[in-house]
Regions:
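Active-site loop/lid in soluble adenylation, ligation, and acyl-transfer enzymes
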Residues: 2-130
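Short beta-strand
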Residues: 59-61, 168-174, 215-219
Length: 335
């Protein structure tokens, strides 16, 4: 058995032990753990504003992308004492969960050191979990559809948002699809974003039945784009922008411009929206953070969009149901 190699490094005011830097985590690309750590170190100025203060689910691949992996919601007990956590009540587990918070470069490097290839974050701040910062649409193609078809649907969604005075940003999933983020950063609830996103997905399916589905049933998805609205949920996390993906090669969930989305659709070339770690670092050096509006732009969810998607009736029904069951709802224990 090869002897484990280790090196001690000083990052800001923290000391970290890095091990097995030569271990290959992406066999097809020969991409090592050391290169994973290097990528996250160099992308830190872009990724940290998007991870900071958001509960984080780790997707870890200790033996590489071709081997077993696991999701980790509870921050590892062996974490350094300076890694911050967020306490989140889990109704399903009937207990508190302690999510990692990726607040700074030392934490980011430590997470990469324990083979966290993918970073999945909540849409909320840990300090205000009931309120999402953004509304998300995950466009997932069912083969033989590709990201090209996702681009078509994405542009149509963008135009709908524009009609209601909303801007939105696009990023690749780093896998097969495209994701649209509507910045909010104002007072809003998941009930509101969920009914609007679901209503819009249903409308698109009604108007474009050959192109779109809104349910995740596999038999419905062949050749169509799933508009997955279900990520708009207080108890879910979704892959963070600039996160590596555990594919054959080290692709990245990458912000893209609408010009690039249009170009991909026109050329019908999915490869135009596939970016590896080196390409993403070069893009950020040239263009900055194309996803910055997601965390900085403030937009209210317009009543016109709520009405257009049937959200008003759905919200009223939810409110009535809440009122009728308010005395029976189980609450987490008092702190």
């Amino acid at each position: 058995m090869a002897k484990e190699t280790a090196v001690e490094v000083k990052i800001e005011d923290r000391t970290l032990k890095l091990t097995n830097l030569e271990k290959v985590l992406y066999p097809e690309a020969g991409f090592t753990k050391g290169q994973v750590i290097d990528y996250y170190t160099r992308i830190a100025p872009a990724i940290l504003p998007h991870t900071r203060d958001h509960p984080l689910t780790l997707k870890r691949y200790p033996n590489g992308v071709d081997a077993e992996f696991f999701y980790e919601k509870n921050c590892p007990k062996h974490r350094p004492p300076w890694v911050k956590t967020a306490t989140v009540w889990s109704g399903g587990n009937n207990r508190d969960m302690y999510y990692c918070l990726c607040q700074d470069l030392p934490t980011l490097v430590w997470l990469a050191q324990i083979a966290t290839l993918e970073f999945h974050t909540s849409l909320s701040y840990a300090s205000n979990l009931p309120e999402p910062r953004t509304m998300v649409f995950d466009l997932d193609p069912g083969p033989p559809a590709t990201i090209v078809e996702c681009c078509k649907i994405g542009l149509m969604l963008r135009d709908v948002f524009a009609e209601h005075g909303l801007d939105c940003c696009a990023k690749t999933s780093g896998s097969k699809g495209l994701r649209l983020y509507v910045p909010l950063n104002t007072k809003v609830t998941y009930e509101e974003t969920k009914v609007v996103s679901k209503g819009l997905a249903q409308l698109f399916e009604e108007q474009h039945p050959d192109l779109v589905v809104h349910k995740q049933l596999k038999e419905l998805r062949t050749g169509r784009v799933l508009i997955d609205w279900s990520q708009n949920d207080q108890y879910k996390t979704t892959v963070n922008v600039y996160s590596l993906r555990a594919r054959a090669r080290p692709t990245v969930s990458t912000p893209v411009s609408w010009d690039e989305v249009e170009k991909c659709l026109k050329a019908k070339d999915p490869s135009l929206l596939v970016f590896n770690s080196d390409q993403v670092l070069a893009r950020v050096a040239k263009h900055g953070d194309l996803f910055e509006p997601v965390i900085k732009k403030k937009q209210k969810l317009p009543k016109s969009l709520v009405a257009a998607t049937g959200g008003a009736a759905a919200l009223e029904k939810m409110a009535n149901r809440r009122h009728s069951t308010s005395g029976r709802l189980r609450k987490p224990p008092a702190k």
